[in-house]
């Protein structure tokens, strides 16, 4: 019936036994009261275009191929994107960050389609897994340093459950810094810390290679700081690294 709310959006099911307990802990996490309150408030108030949907409104686990050799790390769920759809880089509209990212991944063979619009849209990642430095949507897209630290164990656990990962794509500086905290946790962080720069790659014998990229936010893509070609080049470089 028109006007009736749809069923609640839920994350894709864990793609392996190893990921199942990790994702359960992510979804049940309450470490950051400010973020949990914000996500619930957004889920209740909604955006007019999505008033008939039941927002997810909880922490968002990663998704993708459990045998992935490529891990893509973003910043955090968007308030009306993944906080609504329960899938990272999904639901922020035509030309949004999800479509921008997926077009580049599709061109390099890491996704079966160039768009990411909604749960159940047929999207499948190929040899890739998408996660985030922060699992709850933050106000103004700006988590605090403590919130980033609180969330870091979830990224540690997801990487541990993805044993074939050989390259990590860090979308933005927050994700880039999170990657080096991952390396530090394994006792292999380089000194001084590598410099963030779009397309710069850092290799290590004891940790997955890390390649930096500007985040495909509308702020970056609408201003031309990040173009489709620039992001395609990053994933083409990744293809040559695995």
Model-based region annotation:
Residues 6, 14-242:
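A polyanion-binding, active-site-adjacent surface
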